[in-house]
């Protein structure tokens, strides 16, 4: 019996097949083709979203963190889940930070860890900026609201460099080793200047040198020294494992994005629960933007003289705001903690813009 192809080219049927069978075949082919088209469309959408996230990783992390907090805090049936999971996510942050620093330090060049002149110049600038804020607080601190805003700016100037600064610096093309050394030096300076200046800002702030020394020592040891030593030992005894870690592109950076999402959620929570309002709240959110731009600009300006504008800009501009918030809540006016929380947003928007510009044009504009 002669066969002929079906009009859709997917099946063959005999002349004696009923039109009903043919119709079923036709519908089946349409279903298969539509499923294939749906899968291709779905994959295309996923790739477009992923490429968008890669291009704007830091701003996307900020938005995801903020929106995620708002959903789980204000959608009634999701509130219990948010209250249960939130603390666990926050407790996970130090673990992720440790892991991302280990991954980053696997790529470190020991010869780059030699202290540089700009490391100490930036510490003097950082201390001078903090002292300038202390003078302004002495001058205009009689007004409660003015003092609150100045305290917010003060903590943004004085808090040390972020431990994860090397991750963003690596993507921008700076030196991981040099930033690691700078971060250690910055924490040592912190041990001296915070106990010295905090009592001038808040007379009730009794910060002993011993207490601050132990806090800084614990911070430097657990966050920086241990992952650095593990990375160096891994390079010596587990070179194949290190090669596999290094082969995963931007692994440490995406770990940082995960932490940033959680940090942004916590920042939004602090801002929404702040008992200040109106122009005072607006200023506590806006002043850190100018502090952020000033520090990035000064750092880059100093770094240009040492062929290290990227590293120096990140060193002075990217702050450990978690420590800043803790210091404010513990020793200063707790309401001023809104400022270092806002600084998280501004510094990551600056970094996000720098990363976008470098990927688009192959160089940094600033």
Residue ranges of predicted features:
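Short hydrophobic transmembrane-like helices used for membrane targeting/insertion
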Residues: 1, 8, 45-46
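Compositionally biased, low-complexity segments
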Residues: 1-2, 30
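N-terminal amphipathic/hydrophobic targeting modules at extreme N-termini
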Residues: 4-6, 15-17
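Cationic, low-complexity basic patches in intrinsically disordered or flexible, solvent-exposed regions
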Residues: 5, 26, 34
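Intrinsic-disorder-associated, low-complexity terminal segments enriched in Asp/Asn/His/Tyr and depleted
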Residues: 16-19, 31, 39, 43
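Alpha-helical transmembrane segments of multi-pass small-molecule/ion transporters
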Residues: 39-40, 44-366
């Amino acid at each position: 019996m002669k066969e002929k192809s079906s009009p859709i080219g997917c099946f063959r049927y005999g002349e004696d097949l009923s039109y009903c069978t043919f119709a079923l075949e036709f519908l089946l082919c349409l279903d298969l083709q539509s499923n294939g088209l749906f899968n291709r469309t779905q994959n295309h959408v996923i790739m477009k979203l992923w490429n968008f996230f890669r291009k704007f990783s830091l701003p996307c992390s900020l938005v995801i963190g903020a929106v995620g907090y708002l959903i789980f805090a204000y959608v009634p049936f999701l509130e219990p889940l948010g209250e249960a999971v939130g603390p666990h996510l926050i407790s996970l942050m130090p673990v992720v930070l440790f892991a991302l620093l280990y991954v980053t330090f696997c790529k470190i060049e020991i010869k780059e860890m030699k202290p540089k002149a700009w490391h100490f110049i930036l510490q003097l600038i950082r201390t001078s900026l903090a002292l300038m804020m202390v003078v302004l607080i002495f001058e205009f601190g009689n007004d409660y609201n003015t003092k609150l805003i100045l305290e917010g700016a003060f903590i943004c100037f004085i808090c040390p460099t972020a431990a994860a600064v090397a991750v963003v610096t690596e993507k921008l093309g700076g030196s991981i080793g040099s930033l690691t050394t700078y971060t250690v030096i910055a924490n040592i300076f912190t041990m001296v200047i915070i106990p010295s200046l905090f009592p001038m800002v808040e007379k009730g702030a009794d910060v002993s040198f011993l207490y601050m020394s132990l806090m800084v020592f614990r911070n430097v040891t657990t966050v920086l020294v241990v992952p650095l030593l593990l990375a160096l030992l891994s390079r010596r005894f587990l070179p194949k494992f290190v090669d596999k870690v290094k082969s995963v592109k931007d692994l440490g950076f995406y770990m940082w994005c995960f932490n940033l999402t959680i940090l942004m959620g916590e920042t939004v929570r602090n801002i929404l629960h702040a008992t200040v309002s109106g122009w005072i709240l607006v200023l506590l959110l806006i002043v850190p933007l100018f502090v952020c731009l000033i520090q990035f600009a000064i750092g880059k300006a100093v770094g240009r003289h040492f062929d290290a504008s990227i590293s120096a800009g990140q060193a002075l501009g990217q702050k450990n705001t978690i420590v800043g918030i803790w210091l404010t809540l513990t020793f200063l006016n707790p309401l001023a903690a809104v400022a270092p929380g806002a600084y998280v947003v501004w510094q990551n928007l600056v970094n996000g813009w720098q990363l976008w510009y470098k990927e688009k044009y192959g160089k940094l504009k600033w």
